[in-house]
């Protein structure tokens, strides 16, 4: 029993040593990207939506100047980092081939401390993202593309 436990522990430790740390870091950056920008449930955000989401996502201490929420599915967003839904843009960035429904929340002045007030702009935009290991890790901008 003890020998089997030691063998299991050894296999686990070896597995940790063989996992590249960059994979775990990229997963964390991708999760942070989703936390800041992904909201599949809402289709059209308004000012109250922005104030609520910015508070729920902890982006109000200090008040974040601007944030874009993407209302699409994860597979389509991830596909920007590949050829299915993305193409090279400005060096190491990628731009989506298709437009996504988004809500852009802009801080409307006043104090950088809560309570934060936001103005919502909803629409369809192409996304410009930075990718690492085929995962989006930074939303650079959302643009109208002819």
UniProtKB/Swiss-Prot annotation:
Binding site for tRNA: 105
Broad EC category: hydrolase
Active site: 37 (proton acceptor), 138 (proton donor)
Pyrrolidone carboxylic acid: residues bearing it: 25
UniProt EC number: 3.1.27.-
UniProt-annotated location(s): Secreted; Nucleus; Nucleus, Nucleolus; Cytoplasm, Stress granule
Gene3D superfamilies: Ribonuclease A-like domain
UniProt xrefs under PROSITE patterns: RNASE_PANCREATIC
Molecular function terms, GO-annotated: actin binding; copper ion binding; DNA binding; endonuclease activity; heparin binding; protein homodimerization activity; RNA nuclease activity; signaling receptor binding
Protein family: Belongs to the pancreatic ribonuclease family.
Cited function: Secreted ribonuclease that can either promote or restrict cell proliferation of target cells, depending on the context. Endocytosed in target cells via its receptor PLXNB2 and translocates to the cytoplasm or nucleus. Under stress conditions, localizes to the cytoplasm and promotes the assembly of stress granules (SGs): specifically cleaves a subset of tRNAs within anticodon loops to produce tRNA-derived stress-induced fragments (tiRNAs), resulting in translation repression and inhibition of cell proliferation. tiRNas also prevent formation of apoptosome, thereby promoting cell survival.
Subunit structure: Homodimer. Interacts with RNH1; inhibiting ANG ribonuclease activity. Interacts with PCNA.
PANTHER family in UniProt: ANGIOGENIN, RIBONUCLEASE
Protein name listed in UniProt: Angiogenin
Upper lineage: Eukaryota, Metazoa, Chordata, Craniata, Vertebrata
